Amino acid sequence: MSWQQRVDDALTARRVTDTLRRRYVVSQGAGRWLVANGRQYLNFSSNDYLGLSQHPQIIRAWQQAATRFGVGSGGSGHISGYSVAHQALEEELAQWLGYPRALLFISGFAANQAVITALMKKNDRIVADRLSHASLLEAANLSPAQLRRFIHNDTQHLSRLLQSPCVGQQLVVTEGVYSMDGDSAPLAEIQHIARRHHAWLLVDDAHGIGVTGDEGRGTCWQRGVKPELLVVTFGKGFGVSGAAVLCSESVADYLLQFARHLVYSTSMPPAQAQALSASLAVIRSDEGGERREKLAALVQRFRAGVNASRFTLLNAHSAIQPLIVGDNSRALRLAEALRQQGCWATAIRPPTVPVGTARLRLTLTQAHEACDIDRLLEVLHGAGE
């Protein structure tokens, strides 16, 4: 088979199963409204949960820092790219979340890949929730360690997998809030089981940080759990981008030596780090609390109004509200029907989710108003499906 044939066959396979992904060009993609092709839509696809991407205080912080530092960092943090803005943000994050150290990464994908790649060796075992993010599972598959996946949120299955003999170390991997199902992991029980088997716990709280817990400290804080490795990302609740790993002093020093994604990547712009510090200040403030309260009320309003006889609504109380429709083509038709009525929603299909669980992944944000939720419900229940 030629290279071109391989490429063509892969694309054809996606087309015939209605799983071909595409990008949409938008003029505005964050916040309450999405603008595409000159038309304005209510935006139910954004991860900007607290509406901070448009916050004037955060925008101003980025602008001022760009004037001071320029628009790029100029290098890896190991060479010339670790500025006072990066250092300040790391210290603020560590203090906020109660860890000795925080290390910044350019993305959550890079952070997850870096930690697993650097830590896991031959004869080790990774035991991951089967619905863990692609960045975690890909890193686990590529590492020399054995990967075992436990049934989603099934702590008994997790315990059985950890009980089987392992010559090396074991790492349990889960998420705080799951990106496609919107539900939360039983973190306290998972941590208890991990410690009983002398395993470390890695929690990716991309969709919980900033949005849940006291001062927005996330799902782990809310559940009274402190994993050995906590990954937080800044493209959701923070409204910016990037990520950090929270850990001990020794693990941070280890990652600075052996995490190739960190050593060999240009660090985030200092202006971005300063904007993130400004975002953290908003998240921790009374305003941040008010934004979280409003978002929670909107989620409750949506769940109370959904017609359960027409849609399978998962047990999700986060900003992520998936409606399971099953069939790929039906999910695409439903998303298009919503767009025709001015509501922008995204159809999620395999391989992102298991076969037979295609869905509309609706995301609610603090930028929405109650009337927006009511309009979404009206359009959903009137969709010709």
Curated annotation (Swiss-Prot):
The reaction(s) this protein catalyses: 6-carboxyhexanoyl-[ACP] + L-alanine + H(+) = (8S)-8-amino-7-oxononanoate + holo-[ACP] + CO2
Pathway info: Cofactor biosynthesis; biotin biosynthesis
InterPro entries membership: Aminotrans_II_pyridoxalP_BS (IPR001917), Aminotransferase_I/II_large (IPR004839), AON_synthase_class-II (IPR050087), AONS_Archaea/Proteobacteria (IPR004723), AONS_Proteobacteria (IPR022834), PyrdxlP-dep_Trfase (IPR015424), PyrdxlP-dep_Trfase_major (IPR015421), PyrdxlP-dep_Trfase_small (IPR015422)
PTM-bearing positions, type N6-(pyridoxal phosphate)lysine: K236
SUPFAM superfamilies, per the entry: PLP-dependent transferases (SSF53383)
First-level EC class: transferase
Binding-site positions, pyridoxal 5'-phosphate: G108, F109, S179, H207, T233
Keyword Transferase: yes
Key words, A-Z: Biotin biosynthesis, Pyridoxal phosphate, Transferase
Superkingdom: Bacteria
EC number per UniProt: 2.3.1.47
Cofactors, names only: pyridoxal 5'-phosphate
One matching Pfam family: Aminotran_1_2
A GO molecular function held by the record: 8-amino-7-oxononanoate synthase activity
Assembly information from the UniProt record: Homodimer.
Protein name listed in UniProt: 8-amino-7-oxononanoate synthase
Organism: Salmonella heidelberg (strain SL476)
Record lineage: Bacteria, Pseudomonadati, Pseudomonadota, Gammaproteobacteria, Enterobacterales
Gene that encodes it: bioF
